Amino acid sequence: MDSFFADVSEFQAPVSDSYPYKILSIRVCDGTHQDSNFAQNYAWMRNALDSGRLDCGIVYTYVRPNWQDNANTVRQMIDANGGLHPRVVLMLDVESGGNPGGDGSAWINALYNNLAEYAGNPARIIGYANQGDFNTMWLSRPKGLRVIAASYGSNPLLPGQIAHQYTDGAYG
């Protein structure tokens, strides 16, 4: 069974009632940069979760080495917009673009631990990256971490993988 969902940030139009899927992923921030559509997207997500329109929400942050400021931004933005909904998971978007090279496990895991404490359960924190970034940036990952793998050519079947992001060349 396939489950489809979109990744929505300030680079796309805000989510609306035309959204067709049962899962939605929205960006809260890129480090300390606050996504300009987060409040609107999160309000829609919360209402859709409460009404049964959505089954699950994913709120993600593009991780940056200033992990404490990154964590504070995530917490403050969610708290300012109704708090963490019980059917929302937080996702760490781990990508090499704009981040220092090499193993970032120390600061990524510090962010993970901070947000796991905030969420009340480490199972509510998932990771996202392509195989190369997982293997170079996040060498030491928390035990039991579930991940979404970004791979457009083939399914990489990463340890803990729960989803595979790909493209079929179409867009809506």
Would you name each region that the model predicts?
Residues 1-122:
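Substrate-binding cleft of extracellular glycoside hydrolase catalytic domains
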Residues 1-18, 138-172:
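Functionally critical loop-and-helix segments that line ligand-binding/catalytic clefts
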Residues 62, 93, 128-130, 150-152, ...:
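Conserved beta-strand termini and adjacent loop/short-helix elements that scaffold enzyme active sites
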Residues 67-69, 133-143:
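Glycine-rich, charge-decorated loop segments at or immediately adjacent to ligand/cofactor-binding or catalytic sites
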Residues 40, 58-60, 126, 164, ...:
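Intrinsically disordered, low-complexity segments enriched in small/polar residues
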Residues 56, 120-136, 146:
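Aromatic-lined carbohydrate-recognition surfaces of secreted/lumenal glycan-active proteins
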Residues 39, 72-74, 129-131, 144-148:
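Short amphipathic alpha-helical surface micro-motifs
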Residues 32, 65, 133, 155, ...:
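Surface-exposed, flexible loop/turn segments at secondary-structure boundaries
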